[in-house]
Amino acid sequence: MAQSQNSTVDLATPATCLMGLTSHGNVMVGNTAFEYYNERNPEDYIQIPWDEVDYIAAEVLRGTKKITRFAIFTKDNGHFTFSTRDDKETLRAVRKYVDEDKLVRSPDFIDVTAKGAKSIPTVIKNLFHKGN
């Protein structure tokens, strides 16, 4: 059985882990870690201590400012993507333990497409550039 790292829990809410195959469970935001526990298999869990968090990127829908999911990027172990029942409330609870400059907005489809379109002239120029 998994042992929680938190001594106090600020928020516990139903969530979906979007890593590979999706799994449903509960997210707990506490004083020492962000924790996810699978509801079907208690041995399937993710515990991310606050000092291991590099930054958190939230996917915000354009116009509505609704947060659909967020990803926690760690210093060593890659990233973990979650969607909770109320992502905004979850990130507000996380903000208590993570600096605000580490909470960033993830680029959406239009941002990525615009950046790619702006880079086309540079790519074409580099194709015909003679190297010394």
Where are these predicted regions, by residue range?
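Short, surface-exposed beta-strand/loop "edge" segments at domain boundaries and coil↔beta transitions
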Residues: 2, 35-36, 78-83
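Anionic N-terminal interaction surfaces
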Residues: 1-29, 103, 116-131
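Canonical phosphoinositide-binding patch of PH/PH-like domains
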Residues: 72-94
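Phosphoinositide-binding peripheral membrane targeting modules
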Residues: 17-69, 75
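Generic detection of short hydrophobic beta-strand segments and adjacent strand-loop junctions
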Residues: 7, 46-48, 82
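Non-catalytic membrane-recruitment/adaptor modules and adjacent regulatory linkers
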Residues: 9-12, 80, 104-111
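Charged/polar, solvent-exposed surface patches and flexible loops
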Residues: 55, 92-96, 122, 126
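Pleckstrin homology
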Residues: 88-116
